[in-house]
Amino acid sequence: MTAFALSLILAAAVIHASWNYLLKRSGGGTVFVWLFAVSSTLIYAPLAAAIIWWQKPDFGWVHYGLMFASATLHTVYYLLLDRGYRSGDLSIVYPIARGSGPLITVLCAVLLLGEHPTALAVAGALLIGGGAIALTGDPRKLRQSGNLHAVGFALLTGCMIAGYTLVDKIAVAAWLIPPLVQDWATNLGRVVLMTPSALTRRDEIGPTWQRAKRSIVAIAVLCPLSYILVLTAMVFTPVSYVAPAREISILVAALMGTHLLAEGDAPRRLAAAAAMVGGIVCLALG
């Protein structure tokens, strides 16, 4: 992995953990997710239009199909992630979701894209899996405060991460969709898919905006930015390297969960997160 790709991924990781912290702190909800999707689409529309005007890409049905598939997977991802945060702690949900995603992604990259991880990469995958298990601690504790349900949502979120990562890799690397345009189209599709559900809760839209408009706008800026950086790295870097390396955000989220959100058992959680980061480093170097 080049230094430029690694710098993009590290910057994206910090930004990604930051907007997840804001989502957890805000309380979330379907209307909240819809509002920041709408805001993201509006904020990044001028940049997307400028890139399309400048590059004049020749989009066909395959390009639009990849955009729609990514939008669908991202929509399910955000809804599952939000449900997980409302069920359990940030420092449980975030690392398990982000830790399981790369494992599934690497497996699919081997089976579907013909990538071949080394022994060091396999060791990294095992560290990530072990760290995710250690993070949950005593299985009996998972039944407290909804954490068992939160782990389920986190694992489903990991499946969605693998799905949209592979789709977006194909979109930006094989079909040459500009990264910002791919992300913007995904956000637009998410707005379209979520609007019917949001309208059934129209009485919540105004109060949710008034209660959390600063968090909504911040997430609307940070969420696309973090993924645009990742998509840019994926243009010239194998996905089996990018997907695991970006999970350095796990450690950042664990720090936020234990220190900013006062979630307990900091030593165990941070040690488990550190093991997962070690696994990510092995995957990146392998």
Question: Where would I find each of the regions flagged by the language model?
Answer:
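Membrane-interface interhelical linkers
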Residues: 1-69, 76-88, 137-155, 185-221, ...
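Helix-loop junctions at the membrane-solvent interface of multi-pass transporters
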Residues: 49-54, 111-112, 134-138, 175, ...
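Hydrophobic transmembrane alpha-helices of multi-pass small-molecule transport proteins
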Residues: 44, 106-110, 119-139, 268-285
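Specific alpha-helical transmembrane segments that line the substrate/conduction pathway
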Residues: 69-74, 85-132, 181-189, 239-259
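Helix-coil boundary and interhelical linker segments in multi-pass alpha-helical membrane proteins
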Residues: 1-6, 43, 49-63, 105-121, ...
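Hydrophobic/small/kink-forming positions within alpha-helical transmembrane segments
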Residues: 13-17, 45, 71-79, 99-107, ...
